[in-house]
Amino acid sequence: MIKKKMIRYLPTIAIMTVLAVSCTEEIKFTGEKIDPKIVIYSLLQPDSVITVSVAKSHAIFEEKYVPKQITDAVVKLYRDGELIETLTYIEPEPQPEYYPVTPYSKYVSQGVKPVHGSTYRIEVEMAGMKKASGEAGLPGIIPVTGLDTTQDHQADGYLLKEAKVRFSDPAGNNNFYRMAARSTEGLYYGNKTVPWSPEVPVTIFESDRSYASDNDPVITPRKEDQDFFDMQINNTYHIFSDELISGKEYALTLEMNNRLPDTDYYEFSLFDFELQSITEDLYMYLRTTSAHMQSNDAFITEPVLVYTNIENGLGVVGAMSSSTVTLKIGEYPVAGVTYEHSSY
């Protein structure tokens, strides 16, 4: 079993500008040198081939750091202790010159997909560095057992919806979740004073609606006393444990406000609500990463401990299993209707 560690990340220090009379002096960093570590990121999902992103860490004060692809790493995949594959490096797709260079290098399995009941270990070797590794197994699927909705038609043509995603938390285990939501909407921009024209396409918009769960108590627990400095950490990734709902049935509430689709012109709205069952390691990593980012430049906060389950390295190997339910208003796709995707 890999020993789980807490790696201390120092947030960016707010440097106060000192006014000098006529000169400035460059001060070299003289702290203890920190050796680079291997960074590993991998999220195991059913029906998806195993993919690993690797990188090298670098000191925050390192001069002229330039990210580059690591093409010669050795990335080994084990299942239940048995080596089953050495993953293949995949070059990134060409990007415009003004795009930043990605610091992560992708290594992909040629066909291995994780299955429930097995533990997968990923080992990464790079020249001159300590071998790093992390492991995970797929958590059980927690099925969505129902979707309850209420709707309020607004005078301005918008529809206020409340959706309750129902599920039962298994008793006897510590379970961890993430609530994700996405919308796909089709809008017709033709003249609506005349009948629908097949020459006018329905424009499709897609967006992340996970924020709709922000007001649910398991996502944002209520506090009786507000922090004097209003420093409550937001739940960036919409994750939660079963601490408040252990062994119980629960209905998680999402609140949305969107335009009411005009089905006479083949407009539609689709809302996908995805209940993700995630590993404890992934939960801890997302939770502490969120806190780290939000306290990064806070003047009076302590440095945040960011969780990792990587031995001799940084990052996380996690896993998730999902159950999805869809709310549908209108029909999509419809034969004879032209659709185009919005670039915004």
Model regions and ranges:
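Bacterial N-terminal signal peptides that target proteins for export
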Residues: 2-11
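A sequence/structural signal for flexible, mid-protein segments enriched
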Residues: 24-344
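C-terminal motif of bacterial Sec signal peptides marking the signal peptidase cleavage site
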Residues: 19-22
